[in-house]
Amino acid sequence: MIYLVSNQKSLFETDAYKELSLSDAIDMIMPHSWIEYDSETAGLDPYTKPLLCTQYGLGEDQIVIDNVTIPIEKLRCVLEDPTKTFLGWNIAFDLRFLYHHRIVPYNVWDGMIAEKILYLGYPPQFHSLALKAAADFYLGIDIDKTVRGQIITQGLTIPVVQYAAGDVMYLTKIKEKQDAELEKKELTKAAEFEMKFTPVIAYMEYCGAKLDPIKWKQKMSRDKEEVNKAEAALNKWVEDYYEEHKSSTEGYIRVSTEEVPIMEEFKLFDSLNNNMSNVKRVQNPQTGLIHYEYDKAFPYVTRNLQGDLFSGFDTCAKCNVNWSSSQQVVPLFEMLGLNCTTIDPKTKVKKKSADIKLIKPQANKCTIVPLYVEYKKAKILVDTFGQKFIDKINPVSGRIHPDYFQLGADTGRLSATNPSLMNLPHDPFTRSCFIADSGYKWISCDYKGQESFLMASIANDVAMLDELVNGSGDLHSLTARIVFTDIPDDTPLSEVKAKYKPLRDAAKGYEFCFNYGGDWNTLMKNYGLTKRRAQEVYDNYMSGFSGLKRYQEFRREDVLDKGYILLNPITKHKAFIYDWDNLCKIDNELGSPEAKYMLGSNGDNYYKTSSQHLRRRLSDSMKQSINYPIQHAGSMCFKLSAIKFFNWLRKNDLLFTVRYCVPVHDEHNVEAPENIAEEVGKILVKCMESGGEPFCTRAHLGADISIEDYWVH
């Protein structure tokens, strides 16, 4: 039975539900410890849009309370009852509207988060997290969502009341099905842990962060200047290249082929094409080798021979490349000898690209590469971190309120959109644009070398642990001494940074590469090393960090044995290989006599394509099996410490006084009144250190703190 509590008499001109008083509604709700909960709002923002109604599912009965005429504060006795758990779907959204009325439930259960835990590792297109999809998947019920689009424009109407009640009819039944799957997959503890974090992430979204728009505009101007400088440097390089290589024909450059012996001249000649002009055969008088010189079109510069009234005459060749256009950049780069062919990560098909990840390792081929890298870095800052941040400042709160998702990656890490404050540039000026309110202090607290400590602890690598616990903690110097034979073994690590800085800087990249499953082949691709040198560096690294080597070997075997990545042994979070059954099927097929025959034949066929797909997918999964547990442990440290801090704020009646501004993977940023900032900072450090203990068991994971008027870290 559906009941409505409202002072709007027009809403009772139907027999679809019954009228109920607020006191009777509370009497019906109070005996229940698990309550299905949902809300309808006039928009997505609790600061500018009102709460229209809240719904309470009680098994066979659903109660809809009109919060336009019945203040939500009158439900505080229900919503803040610590004996009750509120079961919702994407309940963090509903919590933000409750927080706006300073109502903070103690216990929640989010069916959407439970569903994500069950299918962590699956791409979005493989399994929907929508309530409608879950009702169909688990119960075979089609929930009609057509009314939802009318709520913002029409408000609370009779159809909306019926629709609202429908959203709290099936949550318990879905949860029962989910619970069975969670138990089957040993994920119950993982779900229980994540549910404790859901109120915290809703609080982060509600609090937001304050941006100084004047200083941000200064940052935007600086970023634009850097783009202009980088673009000018690229243009000058192209113009200088043209002047150095230009032929007697305007718009052409003079190009030489490689030198070859006379016996191979016919091959060289055949490689020339009809588009080449003014071809000249040249023989080296000393070696006898042959090469050809010819004119080649160079459409990347133009020359203005007419001038105009305003700019006068400048007959110098000017670069006309749009450096933001891959279609224009790729032909130029290929002409300069750069490889612009890569594999599309989604389609797995070859494509042309001027992506910085592809171009940067080829710096040894052409001096334009470093200039292009600087341009792309500067352009990203302008395109990504510009006016849209100012546009996102809430007109009521005066703050930016991103959308966070607590399982935003297969590792369990948070992600953010609209906009993301988690991947802001680390330069001090950008960070300092985020400020504390007047009378408040900005508290930044981040883990000291979190990934290094977690890597060493989880891998149980003696060399790493010894340096982190008993030494200076400088793993970069230790890595440099291990992989580079130029550094004597008896060199104190304290001297490596000063005496061998270039090698230490290079070691940072190698360290990151190997720690997360890369090998010598990855080193060749990303850093442009020769095969021999890359293999030498890799072998030295794995010999020096034997514990890490054993850990990686175990992880590779374990994922192939289970079909999923065990992210941590405490809560048993798992990242599933979404197509594991299909990969096993392919593996079985490839063992057949027919497959073995076809794999040895010429040309492409089904079995060869399947074999390539299998190798690629298994390779990806093995690399992830090394990377994921480390990143996951970091996210668990962060979440557990945030839960502890949130609970302390609640216990000490400091919620909405101390604001949670920006969560970063290894860093907490909060705002506190000046008179309690020191105390809050000390508590935050304690929460972070205790939050790291269960996941970094072989070394102490400490935290650094700064208390300023703005974001420092």
Question: Whereabouts are the PLM-identified features?
Answer:
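Active-site-proximal helix-loop-helix substrate-binding element of RNase H-like nuclease domains
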Residues: I2-Y17, D45, K49-E183, A191-I201, ...
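Short, contiguous acidic/charged loop-to-helix segments that flank catalytic cores in large enzymes
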Residues: K318, K388-P395, F434, S444, ...
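Short amphipathic alpha-helices in soluble, non-transmembrane regions
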Residues: V680-M688
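Function-dense linear segments that define catalytic or interfacial modules
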Residues: Q55-E60, V64, D403-S494
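Conserved catalytic core of nucleic-acid polymerases
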Residues: P199-A202, Y206, S397, H401-P402, ...
